[in-house]
Amino acid sequence: MPKSKVRKKNDFTVSAVSRTPVKVKVGPSSVWFVALFIGLMLIGLVWLMVFQLAAVGSQAPTALNWMAQLGPWNYAIAFAFMITGLLLTMRWH
């Protein structure tokens, strides 16, 4: 059986550059950031509770008349506060 020819190897082979991405270390979030997103979630919760318990009905106090006039928009406002706080928790370190 005939023998196959042996190929010559190059003296210098160029290796592919392999870089692994380095994760940047980020420090912990500041105290005000944590207070902000917890505060926003609590504001939304309190808004919803006040609307449900005090601003609805014929016995609503006159101080909360403006809230009763908003009607169903109170749900949107309360959930907007809560969702904003929830979205900020994703940036928390």
UniProtKB/Swiss-Prot annotation:
Gene Ontology CC terms: plasma membrane
Cited Pfam families: CrgA
GO biological processes: cell division
Keyword Cell division: yes
Location(s) in or outside the cell: Cell membrane
Coiled-coil features, chain-numbered ranges: none
NCBIfam families (UniProt xref): PRK00159.1
Family: Belongs to the CrgA family.
Name listed for the protein in its UniProt record: Cell division protein CrgA
Biological source species: Mycolicibacterium paratuberculosis (strain ATCC BAA-968 / K-10) (Mycobacterium paratuberculosis)
